[in-house]
Amino acid sequence: LEHREATGIETIISLQTDLLDNRCPIRTSTKLVNTLAARALTEEGQWEPADSVLNAKAILVQLSSSISYLEIVHPTDLMNTLVQDYSETSITWEHTVLDLQLEKGVIRRARLQSWWLHNDSGLELTKELIDRFSQSTPPLTT
């Protein structure tokens, strides 16, 4: 993914079952070390310390004095986000996606974006990236 002030990647998770009726939640886990600070975006649109938010829409981690990492799960795919470990120098969190009953042959997809951005870009850039991703349609791939 490209943006004039950030570099990113998009991960697409696909799930299909051969069982008649199956529940198989998918979880992603991210751990970052040597971090300076971490914030989470609340459902009300406020950035709070990451360990105080129960169900984050996005996680923003300051990696250095100049670079931050932003992780977003598409809002139609996110079931839950849990910060599992948060200290002064590291953070670990888990997203639960696709926690649905699936019927045989049905394919479901979830999308996650990871962005590295300059700290001088401010929260306006994070809002732009989150809004753009939230309004995007999934690619029509198999």
Model-derived features: positions:
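Acidic (Asp/Glu-rich), glycine- and aromatic
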Residues: 2-51
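Extended boundary segments
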Residues: 38-74
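Beta-strand-rich recognition/accessory modules
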Residues: 61-142
